[in-house]
Amino acid sequence: MDYKRLLEIEKLYFSHEDVADLLAIKRGSAAVLCARYVKKGLLTRLKRDLYVRTETFAHLGITDLYRIANLLQVPSYISLMTALSHYGVTSQVQRGFVESVSIKRTKAFDRGGIAFRYLKVSTALYGGFVKDQGLFIASPEKAMIDSIYLASMGRYPLDVASIDLSKLDRKKLVRLAANHPPKTRKFLERMYEETGRSREL
């Protein structure tokens, strides 16, 4: 009966306090209840004291998955091939995972069959993102530079052949690459050379 009451919570994700307020019970009792429903598969635990109904999670759109990605590791922003796919810059199909950049350690979380991956960059290279529909996501050019940087360091498998450089602003790419290691700038140059667009740099 209590689980049916949880359907009244309109938030995408909720805490022990939300459950306690709804059911008029103590927070400790709400925590026990949530843990029980996680074991039964009715709730999915996103992180400490944060849950989503499993049935709801299974039908989430990509924007809500991005919001959850922002939440699982703070601070972070959507980037790499996930952002490039979002902007239509790559032909690579994104299924079953969401990629982000963070200043914390490189890590992956599996939630409800979705892999939320975070790759670490230094504080100096963290940025170039915008807030769109309540979520943080890299600009197209920053997502590209993040991908190139990590690939040039041997930390990311970038599918260069899937990238449509014509959809990116070359001046922004060059400007963003300026504070990255020489390897990154060289990688960018090679990408343009291999696609016959080297004069654009």
Report residues per predicted region:
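Short gly/ser-rich loop at a beta-strand->alpha-helix junction or flexible surface loop bordering the NTP-binding
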Residues: 45-55, 65-125
